[in-house]
Amino acid sequence: MATEEAIIRIPPYHYIHVLDQNSNVSRVEVGPKTYIRQDNERVLFAPVRMVTVPPRHYCIVANPVSRDTQSSVLFDITGQVRLRHADQEIRLAQDPFPLYPGEVLEKDITPLQVVLPNTALHLKALLDFEDKNGDKVMAGDEWLFEGPGTYIPQKEVEVVEIIQATVIKQNQALRLRARKECFDREGKGRVTGEEWLVRSVGAYLPAVFEEVLDLVDAVILTEKTALHLRALQNFRDLRGVLHRTGEEWLVTVQDTEAHVPDVYEEVLGVVPITTLGPRHYCVILDPMGPDGKNQLGQKRVVKGEKSFFLQPGERLERGIQDVYVLSEQQGLLLKALQPLEEGESEEKVSHQAGDCWLIRGPLEYVPSAKVEVVEERQAIPLDQNEGIYVQDVKTGKVRAVIGSTYMLTQDEVLWEKELPSGVEELLNLGHDPLADRGQKGTAKPLQPSAPRNKTRVVSYRVPHNAAVQVYDYRAKRARVVFGPELVTLDPEEQFTVLSLSAGRPKRPHARRALCLLLGPDFFTDVITIETADHARLQLQLAYNWHFELKNRNDPAEAAKLFSVPDFVGDACKAIASRVRGAVASVTFDDFHKNSARIIRMAVFGFEMSEDTGPDGTLLPKARDQAVFPQNGLVVSSVDVQSVEPVDQRTRDALQRSVQLAIEITTNSQEAAAKHEAQRLEQEARGRLERQKILDQSEAEKARKELLELEAMSMAVESTGNAKAEAESRAEAARIEGEGSVLQAKLKAQALAIETEAELERVKKVREMELIYARAQLELEVSKAQQLANVEAKKFKEMTEALGPGTIRDLAVAGPEMQVKLLQSLGLKSTLITDGSSPINLFSTAFGLLGLGSDGQPPAQK
């Protein structure tokens, strides 16, 4: 900031810049010195300390002054110092020096950069220059300043970066790349973009044209791991082996314990060792041959105990497999993929491609590469009543093997027997034909059974007193099996399924069954009949039935049982027809009176008995049973469970008659009960009168005792009455006195409590008012104090913003301007006056200038 002082004292090691306003040339004045400013000079700033560069420091000065060979400052013809514009000068430790006009301290005092060991500065030349050795350096050249040392900066050199040495540990390597053609630390020439590894352990400082890509860690190899590598281009490794582009190989612990991948090696992965136990083997696909190439399409079988690494391109067919250890009940079905011979020299067996054979245990077997294991077979254990279906693949014949453990030969397979869906459902239901015969046919089992093994012989347990018919479709004959028995099906046999009627009334095909129950049993049916007088009735009849079979060993007689597929529906229809015909010839009244006899004779028929009637004719007699000769079904009895009219009016009339009969019976029973009740009432009344007399006598005795006790109590009462009255009066007076005293005491306590409460309330009110007034006063004091602080701070900030120099300039601006105006006129005069004519010297200058006392020119008239 320029100063207007005429006398400027410059301390030691300080300087100022003085501007000559006539020539516009600035110069430097260096202290210690007292400088008297001339009128045509202007001091540009107050004294400033010289620039002092301590040891091991430097600064950069822009636009430095030019010096001659004796380091003297050069001046131009105007006296202005000569500057090297757009140039820089780096100044090291020296005596304090001033900055000449035009010089700028571009970089302040800065310590010199110390380059530590294993560190270097990457330098780049900005201009052409010659170094200390006289070598010419071209702009753009790059080199390293390696430590330890102190770097002296140069204006022609730029520090690009600081390079740190990379520490290479054991089992590590540093991957480098050349940024341009150069020689590495070992003196080997490198081309632009070339990459290589530095494997030496220790700190490595890359050269100027070497770029550090990364630090490569070695892969530690063990006896159980190998490194899978692939060549990215043709190169020769450290062991001198030449690798072609795309070639793959393994590095194991036999080659090296720690392998650092080269720049031209791609790590595909770590291959674990394949270990085969004494009971293991494996099949290697595309094995590597002696020439180091994969034999595509070939196989090699390796049996344990052995450990090896899979070479590149090799793979296991199905991993590590167990050796087939066959017991006496096991076998292997083999298939030849290529012609081969097996066995010893004397017992060699030749197999052509596609041949199948079976080997049996006990033995250990490892299949060769020319053999395929089709399947491992196990002997199937069969109980006496179990079996399997076996089919010969050559002849196609199917047979059943039952009751012995069996192993399939090479030409046999298990055959699945298909059954109709209805038969499958009946077999899977698992219902007991006897115990579950009353359940509905649509009922499902609680837990569905597992699906049937179709290769197993189909078996069915025929319950007691039941029969099952099996039909052989190849032989076209049927056989009947009576229970209890276990029936098994041959491959060509099927069950005869019975489709029976069920429900009330009977519905055809409502129930299906595999076995026929021979009875005795019953079934119920509902039929509708019509009498001769056209009364329609609905009957519910139950029939007991059974099958009569004279000789079970006779196939023809046994086949009669299944001659009628729906014996239930057939029998119910026949019996219903007979009943309808018999009832149609009688009236409702006759049928109502003799329904059981009419139905029995209709169902069983009748025969002439030996009894004769009044006219000498033989009387008919009902038979004991009804026989159906088609299948030997015998109906032994009939039960009329209900008879209901179908017509509503008939049903109402019948109901009224029944109600009338019930009312008559009820009235008779009511009269008898009434008579019995009257008799019992008379007996009870007599007992009651007797009891009353006894009670009256007992009451008289009690009254006598009561009167005696009352007399005694009156005597006692008369003596104690006066005493009790006196005591009660005294007690009342005592209680009344105590109550008055207590009441007065309580009133006094209440008055004291009220007085204390009122005093406390007034005290609290006064305290709160005092606190409120004090708080208001404190707020007003705080407000006034804060306003005073604000005004003081405002005045202080205004004075600081203007500065003391500005305030002084404002104060002396008027007088100084007047003095300068008078000086500019160059007047020199003397004024003589007496004491009677006073002169205002303060306004003299304004008068001379033609201005008023306020400094303004007078208005023109």
Curated annotation (Swiss-Prot):
Pfam families: MVP_shoulder, Vault, Vault_2, Vault_3, Vault_4. One of its GO terms (biological process) is negative regulation of epidermal growth factor receptor signaling pathway. There is a cross-link at residues 444, 704 (Glycyl lysine isopeptide (Lys-Gly) (interchain with G-Cter in SUMO2)). One of its GO terms (molecular function) is protein phosphatase binding. GO terms for cellular component: cytoplasm; cytoskeleton; nucleus; perinuclear region of cytoplasm; ribonucleoprotein complex. The modification N-acetylalanine is found at residue 2. It is found in: Cytoplasm; Nucleus. MVP repeats lie at residues 2-56, 57-111, 112-164, 165-217, 218-272, 273-323, 324-379, 380-457, 458-520. Its main location: cytoplasm. CDD domains: MVP_shoulder. The modification Phosphoserine is found at residue 421. Gene3D superfamilies: 2.30.30.560, 2.30.30.570, 2.30.30.620, 6.10.250.720, 6.20.380.10, Band 7 domain (3.30.479.30), Major Vault Protein repeat (2.30.30.550). Residues 435-454 are annotated as: Disordered. Phosphorylated on Tyr residues after EGF stimulation. Dephosphorylated by PTPN11. The vault ribonucleoprotein particle is a huge (400 A x 670 A) cage structure of 12.9 MDa. It consists of a dimer of half-vaults, with each half-vault comprising 39 identical major vault protein (MVP) chains, PARP4 and one or more vault RNAs (vRNAs). Interacts with TEP1. Interacts with PTEN and activated MAPK1. The phosphorylated protein interacts with the SH2 domains of PTPN11 and SRC. Interacts with APEX1. May interact with ZNF540. Required for normal vault structure. Vaults are multi-subunit structures that may act as scaffolds for proteins involved in signal transduction. Vaults may also play a role in nucleo-cytoplasmic transport. Down-regulates IFNG-mediated STAT1 signaling and subsequent activation of JAK. Down-regulates SRC activity and signaling through MAP kinases. MVP 3 mediates interaction with PTEN. This is Major vault protein. It comes from Rattus norvegicus.
